[in-house]
Amino acid sequence: MSRPRPSCMLLTMSTHITYPLTFLTLSPISGCQEFIGNSIEFAYGKRADNIQGVQTLSGTGGLRIFGEYLNKFFPKKNIYVPNPTWGNHIPIMQNAGLEVRKYRYYDFENRKVDFEGLIEDMDAADDGSCFLLHACAHNPTGYDLSDNEWKQVSDIMLRKNHLPFFDCAYQGFASGNAETDAKAIRLFEDEGHTFGLVQSYSKNFGLYGQRVGCLSIVGKDAEEAKAVVSQFKGLIRPAYSNPPRHGVRIINTILGDESMKALFVDECKFMADRINSMRVELVNNLIATGSTRNWDHVTNQIGMFAFSGLTKDEVIAMRDRHHIYCTLDGRISMAGVTTKNVKYIADSIHDVTK
Ligand code: PMP
């Protein structure tokens, strides 16, 4: 005797039962709308119809989606990044199918921003090129543009019809004040640019493991911004379907509540001040240990990193002789320097540089 077939009705019913439950545990492709609104307000200082966004897999994921968007819709299929820049920018954009070009940012010899070089390169680029800009706490140099320099960059980008793309991975880390750190983004919004922005919550909210980010676009109007976001969704769906839910709820809890937000702002200042005090301590210890090199740049720089000026050989010697690890371009994470290890680090740096 053959077994009875299961009823179709049963299958239909189970779909009805499970569908709403599944739905409750999923974010839509674009992510959590409450989080996107909070993120937009955090960066731009306001919400507006012509600013729309999607939740992303942290800063890296947002960069990749924007790179793919450029590859699909931007006629030039290239992007200018500062020299130097965060090492991962280059493969992210290359893997998205773009040609990566560099614009001058840092004067390695004099350890300061090469502003003339930057302006010359923006001027020389074809009209309508896309430029990646670090919104604050430039990684790895720790040197940001002044207000006046940002205004000049905004002017030239408007004149050349360039497309700005801000990467904001350290809001709150540069000055200790999240509002101040958003000033370049807000200036460009005020000045009427159309532009993209990717935000990471890895460092400022300590959410590295949760992959929390937001990719937003300032369109000429709401219709344009919504059309771009719809294309972002078209890229997200075949990449990872939809983003995770947990980390954004932490952000919503904090940024959606005035007293929690005030606490975050205070703690951010505390953290930025601690890093700055470690810069001073590191230099004081270097001088005390007998180093005659000029270390002024370490205290002039801001953000999480010291672009120390150590050569590749010196970095390797520090690793081999003292078990101190930093990137081969000499970038030291100041977040790892404490009152307990600062003397050891200074002695080790002096040992490999004397
Ligand atoms: N942009 C910059 C400039 C960064 O330094 C980083 C992280 N080091 C990121 C983006 C991406 O970080 P995440 O993917 O962890 O948000």
Predicted regions, residues:
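Hydrophobic beta-strand scaffold residues
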Residues: V100, P164, F195, Y325-C326
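Walker B catalytic acidic pair
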Residues: C168
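Structural signature of PLP-dependent enzymes
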Residues: V229-V248, I254-V283
